[in-house]
Amino acid sequence: MAELVYNEQGRLLFTEEMRKEYTILIPNMLPIHFRLLERIFNNHGYKMKLLTSTGRKIVDEGLRYVHNDTCYPALLTIGQFIDALKSGEYDVNKTALMMVQSGGGCRASNYIHLIRKALKKCGMEQVPVISLNLASLEKNPGFHLTPALLAELITAVCYADLLMLLANQVRPYENNKGDTDKLIDVWTDKLTELNFSYTAFDKTAVQIVKDFSEVPFTPAPDKIKVGVVGEIYIKYSPLGNNDLHKFLESEGCEVYCPGLIDFLIFMGDHHVVETELYHVKYKKYIASKAVKGFFKMMQNKIIKAVGPSRFFGPTPFEEAKKDVEPFISPANKMGEGWLLTAEMIDMINMGINNIVCAQPFGCLPNHIIGKGMIRKLRETYPQSNIVPIDYDPGATRVNQENRIKLMLSTARQQMNEKKAADQ
């Protein structure tokens, strides 16, 4: 067992010795994205394991070690960690935990401390917790985001966004069930072999689009399209949203869910806006502007690759930002900030009027930028059909799915009325 080393504040560090022998567990948020991230870290000498466990036992473990008023994503991720450590599959003396930390004003920035508190409560204080962030928070001698590693991680996010975008547009129409998921597996292996090359991105993206366009499919013009927005973990995570995307597809829908690139551009953008409004943190302004510019460039590459095909690509960030200005200030940055409202407007402009706004119960930012904006959106866009769905330990899956089914019933009724009017 590696020697336990603590910093001056008493935080257990992840050391270079631990890097050689410890398994690092990370909770799953975006299935495609995190599979690619797992591959990258393993290629760079880490032993990373992506947790994909589900079930009520995860919630129960979370409730044992986290206050039930804490954010639902925190409860789930901590429950998933504790469940894995108790499973016997991992040596608790040779296991570390990793959590993505934004460093923003959302309570998600405190998840790291809640994880440590839970570990102490269940007698596993010897397990180090690593913060994965770009805000220079909690440095560890055994974990370094080197330029090469960071470049691969960033490019992998862009590849994963493209894979998710195409998969959502192909899977509901595929002739042979499972073809789309097999193609994702194929491209996961290919991208790993390419080391998630940035220089080959343009060429590779075009090939990915070509491969997805060749999946045998049957058009279904009457298929209902449903957009999914909300708090970042609940929106994407199958554990957090009770497999919402799969449920919608089982109900005969095509799901549209915005990619992670928009959120990363938004993170850079709000630092730029903050500096322009308050004239502070000029160094952060320069860095944020560079991050924003890079991801906007990558988004444009995806739009260009998808352009000639039958698929539709993401809306350019600046266009979405301009559309949301009459509704909410660009200075509204907590949680998903104005971006969540912009995503709903963007979907409606694309003709996707049916939207599920998924959020943890009691998530203050989402009550403002999600639920709080629905009335105004309905007034401006009467055709919009938006349903907010809360997720928490006491919410039953049946009630959530029944509310979504009611929204889908309204969507089918609107479709039939439109058909009748067009005849």
Each language-model region and where it sits:
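An N-terminal assembly and electron-transfer interface module characteristic of large anaerobic redox
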Residues: 1-423
